[in-house]
Curated annotation (Swiss-Prot):
Source species taxonomy: Bacteria, Pseudomonadati, Pseudomonadota, Alphaproteobacteria, Hyphomicrobiales
Enzyme category, top tier: transferase
Entry keywords, A to Z: ATP-binding, Isoprene biosynthesis, Kinase, Nucleotide-binding, Transferase
Family to which this protein belongs: Belongs to the GHMP kinase family. IspE subfamily.
Protein name in UniProt: 4-diphosphocytidyl-2-C-methyl-D-erythritol kinase
Gene it is expressed from: ispE
Organism this protein belongs to: Bradyrhizobium sp. (strain BTAi1 / ATCC BAA-1182)
Length: 301
C-alpha cells in the first residue's frame, strides 16, 4: 500500500507496545540466534513519533521515560533510518521527535516499535510500500522484533522474527505491569543456557502445537488455546530478576483474571480478563497496592 504526503508537513505514527502472548524458544542456531515461535499482539499504549521532513536526520526524545532511552546516537529510530537511507538512494529524511512513555528493556518491544514507526513514517514521506523488500530487510537488520512491529497487527512470529502470519484476535481486555526494573534480553537468553545448535523444543512438541482460533472466536477460546503454550523465557527471567514473580503473583490474585504471564524477556507481565471493567478494576487496585510500578489497563488486539 503506497502513501504520499506534502513535503514539510509533520507526520506522526504510534509505536505500540508489543506483547508476546506465547513464546517458545525452539532452539539456538549455529550462528548464535534463537529460533522462536510466538503469538504476538499489540496494546493500546504507545510511544509517539513525529517526523518533520528536512535535510538533516536528527532525533530528540521527550516524555516521562525519555531519560531511560540512553544515548540518542544508539536509538533504534536512527539506526533504522540510516539503514533505510543506505538501501534507498535519495531517501528523504528529517527531524524525529520521540515522546517516550513505554518502559525500556521491558519485554514489550518499545525500541523496536519506535524503529518500526520510523520506517512507516519514512515510507509515507517517500511513497514506499511497507512490503518493499528493502524496507523489510532493513526492519530485520535493525532488530528481531522490528518486522512484527511494522504492521503492528496480531500474528504468529517464527524464525528469528521474520516469518509472520496474521491472526484474527478478538479485543482482549488486559493489565500490563512493569516493576520499573530493566531486564537485558541477552542476560535472559544467557540464563536459558542454550549453546549454538541446541534444541529446547523437540520435533514432537512442534508438531503438536495448538492451532489458533479463527475469526469469531471468543476471549475464552483464545485463553484456552494460549494456556497450552507458555513463555519459555519466564523461568530464566525469574532467575535474572525475581521481582517478576511478585508481579505475576499480583496479577494472578486479581479479580476476574483468566491468564497471566510474562511478555518477551521481561520484566513486563500481562493478564487477560473477561471484561474491560474487570481489567480496569484490577489495574486500579494493583496501582494502589504498588504505586512504584508502571501499570496500564487497556486492551490487546
Amino acid at each position: 500500500m503506497l502513501a504520499s504526503t506534502v513535503t514539510g508537513a509533520p507526520l506522526q505514527e504510534q509505536g505500540r507496545a508489543k506483547v508476546n502472548l506465547t513464546l517458545r524458544v525452539v532452539g539456538r542456531r549455529v550462528d548464535g540466534y534463537h529460533d522462536l515461535e510466538s503469538v504476538v499482539a499489540f496494546a493500546d499504549c504507545a510511544d509517539q513519533l513525529t517526523l518533520v521532513p528536512g535535510p538533516e536526520l536528527t532525533l530528540t526524545t521527550t516524555g516521562p521515560l525519555a531519560a531511560a532511552c540512553g544515548e540518542t546516537s544508539d536509538n533504534l529510530v536512527l539506526k533504522a533510518a540510516r539503514l533505510l537511507a543506505e538501501s534507498v538512494p535519495g531517501l528523504k529524511l528529517g527531524a524525529f521527535e520521540l515522546e517516550k512513555v513505554l518502559p525500556v528493556a521491558a519485554g514489550i518491544g518499545g525500541g523496536s516499535a519506535d524503529a518500526a514507526a520510523a520506517l512507516r513514517l519514512l515510507a509515507r514521506l517517500n511513497g514506499l510500500s511497507l512490503d518493499d523488500p528493502r524496507l523489510q530487510a532493513v526492519a530485520l537488520k535493525t532488530g528481531a522484533d522490528v518486522p512484527v512491529c511494522v504492521p503492528s497487527r496480531a500474528c504468529t512470529m517464527t524464525g528469528v522474527g521474520e516469518n509472520l502470519q496474521p491472526l484474527a484476535l478478538p479485543v482482549l481486555p488486559c493489565v500490563m505491569i512493569n516493576p520499573r526494573v530493566p531486564v537485558a534480553t541477552k542476560d535472559v537468553f544467557q540464563a536459558l543456557g542454550l549453546k549454538p545448535g541446541d534444541l529446547l523444543v523437540g520435533v514432537t512438541d512442534v508438531l503438536t502445537a495448538p492451532s489458533w482460533p479463527t475469526a469469531g472466536a471468543s476471549i475464552g477460546d483464545w485463553v484456552s488455546a494460549l494456556d497450552q503454550v507458555k513463555n519459555d523465557l519466564e523461568p530464566p527471567a525469574l532467575k535474572v530478576q525475581p521481582i517478576i514473580g511478585t508481579v505475576l503473583d499480583a496479577l494472578r490474585a486479581s479479580h476476574g483474571v483468566l491468564l497471566a504471564r510474562m511478555s518477551g524477556s521481561g520484566a513486563t507481565c500481562f493478564a487477560i480478563y473477561g471484561s474491560e471493567a474487570d481489567a480496569k478494576a484490577a489495574g486500579a487496585q494493583i496501582s494502589a497496592d504498588h504505586p512504584e510500578w508502571w501499570v496500564h489497563a487497556g486492551t490487546l488486539s
